[in-house]
Amino acid sequence: MSSGDRKHASGGAVTVSRMRAMKREGRPLACLTAYDYGFAAACERAGVDLLLIGDSLGMVVQGHETTLPVTVDDMVYHTRCVARACRRALVVADLPFMSHTGVEQGLHNAGRLMKEGGAQMVKLEGGAEQAALVERLAQNGIPVCGHLGLKPQQVHKIGGYRVQGREQADAERMEADALALEAAGADLLILECVPAVLAQQLSERLTVPVVGIGAGGGCDGQILVLHDVLGVTEQPPRFARAFGAEGGGVHAALEAYVAAVRAGTFPGPEHGFEA
C-alpha cells in the first residue's frame, strides 16, 4: 500500500483542526511516544493518532535516570527518524530541559525541531510563565502542545515523580495555567499524573483537546510511553497497562491499546489517581 493509499484508508492525516473536531465529536485521541522509524511505522499501521518524540527517550532509549541530559540535537535526530514513518499520525516533539529558557532561544530550537526534524508540533513543559513563548511560537506558525501536572524536567524541584494538583490551591493554579496556555495559542494540552476529577474538569473547560497520562478516563485522549505499552519496562508506572504482556506480539499490542482508548476501556479506575 502506498503512502497515499494509507492516508486515504485511514481517513486522512491527523491535524490540529481534526483533533479539535474529534474533541467536539467525543472521539478519543489514541497517542503514544515513539523514538525511531521501525516502531513509528508500527504505530502508524495500528492507527495511532499522535506520536510524541518525548524527552523520555533519555530514560527508555539512552538509559539515564531522568530526562534532563537530553539535548536538542538528540531530539532533532529522533524526530527525523519518526517523521519519516508518519503519513497519518501527527508528529510532536519535546523541547528538552533548558532549551527554552527565553523566548528567542525557544523559538530557535522549536524551529529546528520543525525544519530539521520534521515535527508538526512542539511540546513544552510549564504554565503561565511559558505564555509569552507559546504566543511567539503561534505567531510564527508553530503549533504548540502544553504540559501540566507532573513535569519530569522539574523532577528535582518537586522532589520526585509525584501526583500533582491534589491540593485545592494547586488545582486552581493548574486551571489558571491551562487557561493561560490556551489563551496564548496552545493547540493541545497534556496532563500528567493529575487526579481524574481535576483532569476531567479541565478537559471540559478548555476548547483545545486535553490528553492524559495518569489523569483518568475523562480526558479527550490518552498517551503512554511505548515501552510501557509493549511491556518491556522493568518497573512500569501504575497508570500504564502492558498490552504487550497479554500476548500477540507488537502489532497486536498496539492495536489493542488503540482500540481500548477509543472504546473508553482504558484507562480504568485502577490506572488513575484520586484527589
UniProtKB/Swiss-Prot annotation:
<keyword id="KW-0566">Pantothenate biosynthesis</keyword>
<comment type="subunit">
    <text>Homodecamer; pentamer of dimers.</text>
</comment>
<keyword id="KW-0963">Cytoplasm</keyword>
<dbReference type="InterPro" id="IPR040442">
    <property type="entry name" value="Pyrv_kinase-like_dom_sf"/>
</dbReference>
<dbReference type="GO" id="GO:0005737">
    <property type="term" value="C:cytoplasm"/>
</dbReference>
<feature type="binding site">
    <location>
        <position position="94"/>
    </location>
    <ligand>
        <name>3-methyl-2-oxobutanoate</name>
    </ligand>
</feature>
<feature type="binding site">
    <location>
        <begin position="55"/>
        <end position="56"/>
    </location>
    <ligand>
        <name>3-methyl-2-oxobutanoate</name>
    </ligand>
</feature>
<dbReference type="InterPro" id="IPR015813">
    <property type="entry name" value="Pyrv/PenolPyrv_kinase-like_dom"/>
</dbReference>
<feature type="active site" description="Proton acceptor">
    <location>
        <position position="192"/>
    </location>
</feature>
<dbReference type="InterPro" id="IPR003700">
    <property type="entry name" value="Pantoate_hydroxy_MeTrfase"/>
</dbReference>
<keyword id="KW-0460">Magnesium</keyword>
<dbReference type="GO" id="GO:0000287">
    <property type="term" value="F:magnesium ion binding"/>
</dbReference>
<feature type="binding site">
    <location>
        <position position="94"/>
    </location>
    <ligand>
        <name>Mg(2+)</name>
    </ligand>
</feature>
<feature type="binding site">
    <location>
        <position position="55"/>
    </location>
    <ligand>
        <name>Mg(2+)</name>
    </ligand>
</feature>
<comment type="similarity">
    <text>Belongs to the PanB family.</text>
</comment>
<comment type="pathway">
    <text>Cofactor biosynthesis; (R)-pantothenate biosynthesis; (R)-pantoate from 3-methyl-2-oxobutanoate: step 1/2.</text>
</comment>
<dbReference type="Pfam" id="PF02548">
    <property type="entry name" value="Pantoate_transf"/>
</dbReference>
<comment type="function">
    <text>Catalyzes the reversible reaction in which hydroxymethyl group from 5,10-methylenetetrahydrofolate is transferred onto alpha-ketoisovalerate to form ketopantoate.</text>
</comment>
<keyword id="KW-0808">Transferase</keyword>
<dbReference type="GO" id="GO:0003864">
    <property type="term" value="F:3-methyl-2-oxobutanoate hydroxymethyltransferase activity"/>
</dbReference>
<protein>
    <recommendedName>
        <fullName>3-methyl-2-oxobutanoate hydroxymethyltransferase</fullName>
        <ecNumber>2.1.2.11</ecNumber>
    </recommendedName>
</protein>
<keyword id="KW-0479">Metal-binding</keyword>
<feature type="binding site">
    <location>
        <position position="123"/>
    </location>
    <ligand>
        <name>3-methyl-2-oxobutanoate</name>
    </ligand>
</feature>
<dbReference type="GO" id="GO:0015940">
    <property type="term" value="P:pantothenate biosynthetic process"/>
</dbReference>
<feature type="binding site">
    <location>
        <position position="125"/>
    </location>
    <ligand>
        <name>Mg(2+)</name>
    </ligand>
</feature>
